[in-house]
């Protein structure tokens, strides 16, 4: 045993580990299953999350994407690439933030998460498999805290 820790205890700890920091958390709400990955977002991490999400064998899927911040002069191009990928893969999507708002797309965009929460009060999302992915400052976790999804 390494560090004199029983391997069974290590195994039990790993099996019972549940992330709680908005990094790939899976949360079951009353209506949906939600992957909460809204601690950080950059083009590489968003594309990796989307590639994995599109492989999930669920029929009613929704991506809620928050802006990728701090991209400087490549921001518009990178946000466009993400939305082009989503559109070409026929993934349902809602975006949050002013960066995604600059992209010409057919997806619903809300400048703030509070505006999206207001929209969802009258437009419930049910029986869905949802990916929340965005930069921390967008505060997508408020969708869980407000019981909007």
Residue ranges and their predicted role:
Residues 1-149:
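ATP-dependent carboxylate-amine ligase
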